[in-house]
Regions:
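N-terminal helical cap/lid subdomain that shapes the substrate entry/recognition surface
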Residues: 5-12, 18-109, 134
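Short loop-to-alpha-helix "cap/lid" segments that border enzyme active sites
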Residues: 160-176
Length: 210
């Protein structure tokens, strides 16, 4: 933990950082596109799209893949319902015990002890994610056992790479103090771009992308 001692605030993405979503969100994206087009994009198709840095939202990524494939594109609300059916396999706002979707196939990439160690080192931490709130709360609170973790999820702020959510949570955790350093740990081009935009909007703060 000493290597991170200079980090006053450490913010995490969730998908691809806290949990592996290759068999859940990515799979739901593939199945959704296949449902509407008969074509199932492979991992490289999705990676190329994500590498553009503008498709952090998997619903919009699904729609964009369908547009580029040609043919009819469904209504966004209808696509979201179909996607959620694959991912949650039940009511997103309902009892997670009744979910039967791909969300059950998400290996954790960290252990709860990590956050105890961060707190013990005086590092303030939280999560900025494009995940739906029920999904984010499920992994953080039920699977990791974190109590009311600082979180910005889908709908709390504009989608990344807009830095609003990142800046907002950093300000909340700073609590009026000037941070020594703010690091954001993500896994996509959109996450890096979010930090770049945060630097432009708050150049007085020391932003770092991990």
């Amino acid at each position: 933990m000493q290597a991170l001692g200079s980090f006053t605030i450490l913010l995490f993405d969730i998908d691809g950082v806290i949990r592996d979503v290759a068999g859940s969100y990515r799979r739901a994206l593939q199945e959704t596109v296949a449902h509407y087009s008969g074509w199932r994009p492979d991992a490289s198709d999705i990676d190329r799209l994500k590498a553009e840095g503008s498709w952090n939202n998997d619903w919009d990524a699904s729609l964009e893949l369908l547009r580029r494939r040609g043919g009819s594109v469904p209504d966004r609300d209808a696509l979201i319902e179909r996607f959620s059916g694959f991912y949650f396999g039940g009511d997103p706002e309902g009892d997670p015990g009744n979910w039967r979707g791909f969300i059950g196939d998400e290996p954790l990439l960290v252990e709860a002890q990590l956050f105890e160690d961060l707190s013990a080192a005086g590092i303030r931490w939280g999560f900025v994610s494009g995940a739906e709130p029920p999904s984010a709360r499920f992994v953080l609170q039920q699977r990791l056992g974190l109590v009311d973790p600082p979180l910005i999820a889908m709908g709390d702020a504009p989608d990344k790479p807009d830095p609003t959510g990142l800046i907002r949570l950093a300000e909340r955790l700073a609590a009026g103090e000037r941070p020594g350093r703010i690091a954001y740990l993500g896994d996509t081009v959109a996450d890096v771009r979010t930090v770049v935009h945060a630097r432009s909007q708050r150049p007085d703060w020391p932003w770092c992308s991990l």
